[in-house]
Every structure is written in C-alpha cells, then in structure tokens.
Amino acid sequence: MPEIHLGAHTIRSHGVTVARFHMHDWLILLLLIVIEIVLNVIEPFHRFVGEDMLTDLRYPLQDNTIPFWAVPLIAVVLPFAVICVYYFIRNDVYDLHHAILGLLFSVLITGVITDAIKDAVGRPRPDFFWRCFPDGIGIFHNVTKNVLCTGAKDVVKEGHKSFPSGHTSWSFAGLGFLSLYLSGKIRVFDQRGHVAKLCIVILPLLVAALVGVSRVDDYWHHWQDVFGGAIIGLTVATFCYLQFFPPPYDPDGWGPHAYFQMLADSRNDVQDSAGMNHLSVRQTELESVR
C-alpha cells in the first residue's frame, strides 16, 4: 500500500482519542511497573554454594562499566528519541503512540521475566566470593560446607542474581525493538540490495551486544547469563513489535496496523457517504418524475 501523509492525525488532534482507545494497555504497563518493583525488593533464592564451588566464583569485585542508571537511557530513551524524530517528520500519531507503547511493553515485559527468573534461580555471580567474604576469609557450615556469608546483606543479595543478565535483556529489548522499527521505516527488505540499510539496522543490535560483553568483562555475569538475557530481550521485542506493526519484510511494514485500519475505515465512510448521496439523488429524481 502506498504511503499517505496524515497531516491531520497529530498528537493535538487525535492523541487523546488514540490513548483512550488503548487505556487498558497503559493500565497493564502500570501493573508491570509494580510487579517489577516487587521483584527487585523480594529476596532471591539463595542457591547452595559449597566450598569447592568457589573456585569459579573468585573473580574480582569491581564497578560496572555501564552503570545501572545508564541502562534505561540505552534501552528506552535512545529508541524513544528516534521514534519522536520520525513523528516530527511524518506527523503520524498512530505510529508515535504504537511505537512508544510497544517499546515500553518490550522493556517492561522483559524486565519482569528477567527478574522473576533471577529470583527463582539464584545463580551466584562470578565475583560471589568477594561479595560473601569481603575480608577474603571464607567461613563454611561444618556439615554441608555451604557458605556463611559475612558481607553486607544487599551486596550478597545482589550476588545471587546472575542469571539472566538484566543489562543485556533490557538492552536487547529496547534496541532490538528499535532495530525492527528502523527495518520497517527504511524498508531494509525491499529486495533492492541496499546493504547500507542493513548496517543501520544492525547498529542497535551491536550496541546491545557490547553491553552484554561488558557484563562478562566486569565479572558480574557468566557468558550463559548474557546469552540468556539476549534471547529473552530479543524474543520479547519481536513479539511486542509484531503486535503493533507488520513484519519489516512486509510491503506495508513501514506503518502500524492502526494506520491501515484507519485508512480502511475512512474508505468505508466515504463509500457509505457516496451511497447515501446517490440514494438521495435517486429519490429526488423519482419525486420530480411524479
């Protein structure tokens, strides 16, 4: 379907109507935020860590290359900025609303899944020894040889949240969604062989991958944690994107489903109006004959 500019369908003219139509979706987003907060507050499962298991958990405890506060900037703010730029170019409130809604769902659903698994699995991080024994002196149960941590409670708690990587899953959820969004907008799969378009689409995924690599380099995660986080984030991003947009390889992949539904409704209204006018003319002709 050819692209048609919708100059009248802006935030000011139709924003409230579109948002109200999806009010239940926004309420679900609020519920996901509450669930995410709860999952971060509760205590994760403290998996058994024997004395002989600490051989692989003695990596140094160090700061994050990418701090926690930077993850929302990478996963949410950056894609949000790109979506807003496209809105100012096209002035399509349907695209703006559905892209933002899809992005937020992608990140929040990923966050809930990630933290739920973290709390349930309780896998120790590679630097767990130094979290558990900051003075370097290990203390173990006489019978089971399980660790008896002397470190700060919050530090030890965080040490049981290795799998999967939250940095990685969030990054792939947000930037994966952005990659799909750009794929549709610049028509990467139009079969014209423009590899430059493909490079643009791969760039967000590369950034997400580098975030994952930094988690292994910082000894905050095992490689399996990063791989699992990437799979979760990218899978959720794909499902959330397809909920609002056609696949990027579709000829209509440049616009949201709501855009094409609006066009169909507009055509039906025009046809109904034309039919009513034709009927009115026929009635007038009949009356004049009489």
From Swiss-Prot:
Its main location: membrane. It is a multi-pass membrane protein. GO terms for molecular function: acid phosphatase activity; phosphatidate phosphatase activity. CDD domains: PAP2_containing_1_like (cd03390). Disruption phenotype: No visible phenotype under normal growth conditions, but mutant plants show hypersensitivity to ABA and significant PA accumulation during seed germination. One of its GO terms (cellular component) is membrane. Coiled coil: none annotated. Pfam families: PAP2. It is an enzyme of class 3 (hydrolase). Keywords: Glycoprotein, Hydrolase, Membrane, Stress response, Transmembrane, Transmembrane helix. PA phosphatase activity not inhibited by N-ethylmaleimide. The chain crosses the membrane at residues 26-46, 69-89, 93-113, 162-182, 193-213, 226-246. It comes from the Eukaryota. GO terms for biological process: phospholipid metabolic process. Expressed in roots, stems, leaves, buds, flowers and siliques. SUPFAM superfamilies: Acid phosphatase/Vanadium-dependent haloperoxidase. InterPro entries: P_Acid_Pase_2/haloperoxi_sf, P_Acid_Pase_2/haloperoxidase, PA_PP_rel. Its EC number is 3.1.3.-. It is found in: Membrane. Glycans are attached at residue 142. Induction: Constitutively expressed. Not induced by stress, mastoparan or hypersensitive response elicitor harpin. Down-regulated by ABA. May play a general 'housekeeping role' in lipid metabolism. Exhibits both diacylglycerol pyrophosphate (DGPP) phosphatase and phosphatidate (PA) phosphatase activities with no preference for either substrate. May play a role downstream of the ABA signaling pathway during seed germination and in stomatal movement in leaves. Belongs to the PA-phosphatase related phosphoesterase family. PANTHER family: LIPID PHOSPHATE PHOSPHATASE, RE23632P. This is Lipid phosphate phosphatase 2. It comes from Arabidopsis thaliana. The gene is LPP2.
